[in-house]
UniProtKB/Swiss-Prot annotation:
It comes from Thermus thermophilus (strain ATCC 27634 / DSM 579 / HB8). Belongs to the aconitase/IPM isomerase family. This is Aconitate hydratase A. One of its GO terms (biological process) is lysine biosynthetic process. Binds 1 [4Fe-4S] cluster per subunit. [4Fe-4S] cluster binds at C441, C507, C510. Involved in the catabolism of short chain fatty acids (SCFA) via the tricarboxylic acid (TCA)(acetyl degradation route) and probably the 2-methylcitrate cycle I (propionate degradation route). Catalyzes the reversible isomerization of citrate to isocitrate via cis-aconitate. Also able to catalyze the hydration of cis-homoaconitate to yield (R)-homocitrate, but with a lower efficiency. Could catalyze the hydration of 2-methyl-cis-aconitate to yield (2R,3S)-2-methylisocitrate. The apo form of AcnA functions as a RNA-binding regulatory protein. Keywords: Amino-acid biosynthesis, Iron, Iron-sulfur, Lyase, Lysine biosynthesis, Metal-binding, RNA-binding, Tricarboxylic acid cycle. It catalyses: citrate = D-threo-isocitrate; (2S,3R)-3-hydroxybutane-1,2,3-tricarboxylate = 2-methyl-cis-aconitate + H2O.
Amino acid sequence: MKNSFQTLKTLTTKSGTYGYYDLQELERKGVAEVSRLPFSIRVMLESLLRNEDGYQVTREDIEALARWRPDPGEINVPLKLARVILQDFTGVPAVVDLAAMRDAIKAKGGDPKRINPVVPADLVIDHSVQVDAFGTAYAFFYNVEKEYERNRERYLLLKWAQNALENFRVVPPGTGIVHQVNIEYLTKVVMTGKRDGLTLAFPDSLVGTDSHTTMVNGLGVLGWGVGGIEAEAVMLGQPYYMLAPRVVGFKLYGELPEGATATDLVLTVTEMLRKHGVVGKFVEFYGPGVAKLSTPDRATIANMAPEYGATMGFFPVDEETLNYLRQTGRPEELVELVEAYTKAVGLFRTPEAEEKVQYSEYLELDLSAVEPSLAGPKRPQDRVPLKEVKKSFLAHLTKPVKERGFGLSEDQLQRKVLVKRRDEEFELTHGSVVIAAITSCTNTSNPSVMLGAGLLAKKAVEAGLDRKPWVKTSLAPGSKVVTDYLEMSGLMPFLEALGFHLVGYGCTTCIGNSGPLPEDIAKAVEEGNLVVAAVLSGNRNFEGRINPHVKANYLASPMLVVAYALAGRMDIDFTTEPLGFDPNGKPIYLKDIWPSMEEIREAIRKTLDPELFKKEYSKVFEGDERWQALPAPTGELYQWDPESTYIQNPPFFEDLGERKVEDIRGARVLLVLGDSVTTDHISPAGAIPVKSPAGQYLISKGVKPEDFNSYGSRRGNHEVMMRGTFANIRIKNLMLDGIEGGYAKKLPEGDVDFVYNVAMRYKAEGTPLLVIAGKEYGTGSSRDWAAKGTYLLGIRAVLAESFERIHRSNLVGMGVLPLEFLPGENRETLGLTGYEVYDILGLEDLKPRKLVDIVARREDGSEVRFQAIARLDTPVEVDYYKNGGILQTVLLNMLKEAKATE
């Protein structure tokens, strides 16, 4: 490695002597004023200094980033990251790709063992558990049993990977949620590694195959979500290429008032940042209010960066970070190293250091103005103060669908359905809460809101309140430590008394694994076509995500989740209406059972012990007896089973070789879509309908509908996933009138069929395909199958008004061209309907962000000519596109290197 600026120094702690690259030396040498750089940019700069090789990372790269300005312009940053994290929904297809790459390199005469993570990778199995059983003491055991039954093939693949791949660890099922395991155990904040006989210290940094990887930003660790294909490239030693971002400085001051929680704060921050516009930017928090937030509070805010649209929500390392490392049982010598290193290198936050920093844009929030809130019913940025939820929900019932309402007429509002059970009967109506889920790493990582929920449950039970019988209740924490401290505090029995029994350690309801509603409830919802609600402590509430029967979804703190389980309806004003009545008929209001901050702090003091973390994480990679009993396949190549409906060798590397890039001519439009189309819309993760192309494929393979599992669990099989692309029941193809769901029109014939069937007919004719969309295309999860499925359907380009960051780069990574309308232009202004035939010209000599010419020929022979920006943002992305994708580029380079050394 080079050291052009002579910044390599040493520091000594009790645990030894470490080499480190001193950022502050650049300032002393007059290269750049590093002290005015945002802390997040400094972490990136350190990576460049440490990895300068004159080829992938050059002296010029370092100088350009060191001289970052609030309006940074075009600075290409080749980031070398310290590690990669994966979850199993996105991790399984990544492992499938690595296995397929081993096959491909062997077929070309190369060594399969060259395909190995160079960068350490940890995969946490958390996305597969579903809430089949709930509300009973045996729910956890039943759900885990079902999880293993459904996912045996996938888990065998992951065990093969654990054995066959170097630098690859797996956290088995039933252990925790990836981001919570990451902040409580995996991240060290400061890493060490050997180079040239010296032990180097350097900041932890990572990418993850899940958009909420940003949670670790709460500990001052650089990290964000990427698609599986990009994560694989990083694992294989490729730099992660990005443009230096604008950094929004978000000042926090004051203190949270009594009654407000970290959840209320994050929903407020999300609303503010979505309004401000932070897509593609870093957000860095500073100011006196930061010191008033615990690390779990910060991690809650960082977790929801995808919801506010930022690449990161960054809190620099400070005294509170060190406290958290101690609280979670990290070794004292690590804490000492983190403190010594971050102070030596200029990465430790102090009020004096903050004052010098220059940001691109500024926002501020007085924490004392935060009030109890929910977000919904369809988007995480749509915050509603608790006191206005009733009014807001009732208004949404009749609001038009295009204004994110439910479009009910006045006479539909009165619908009620009587449900009769053996020992009771009750009415369901619009606004009945049918799911109340304490779920998601966003909140279950935060002891204050979890113990708060337990205290609220205790007071409710003591007042004689109970959950409503139509509410499906669940508790799914992100780590075993949560149940340990809930049990130690004596609060678990009160949560269980209200039906909040442990259902699993995993994502569950937050990602749509809410399991089926009880049959009588589902039937009543269908019969009355009711707009029923879910209240969850998650981070996403997009339509159609949580449960196919539930149209209104609200994000809330765990305490409010319990409150809505007691109320059983959204049309309640907690400030004026009682939750229920005690045995003497006395009304009980929410304020009567809401725990005080002092009660919560006292519960934390009594129960949160570093030994809990040490105990649970000492065996984090072991798994239960089921995991240990799985017969792990061996060998450097994976043995594909042609009969498997979970794992198949994908066709991505069949035509490996440099391709000639040509103009796209004679393209037809498969779908015209509106704004905020999510990756959930493009590639759903939840249930597979029987009559869908994916369902019919599985039936043809002898799979019974009750064994379909979910789309997310079948991401290792491209045959299922390409059939599931654009198959969300809530997607709206604007080329079709009055039809919702995954349908398209075959042109010029004009007949309507499933998207997959129409795409295959076009493919048979050799017709390239195009998708046209509005703003924020691809928002939501970092789901690489949204790009892989797009590619496999034969879609060559996506033309949108704007793209969410991860999905745009995933499209490039699959060799699909993202095209952006020029500012002020869109489908409507240009009069495009989707019935035209398209030529996309000027692709032979592509360069970053080139303007390409598009000709749209209408049915009457007239033409619309316009230009669009080819969103290949860096020279490297142009190469990826030319080679057919990022993994193809990596393989081609490996084969070239192997030839050169022969």
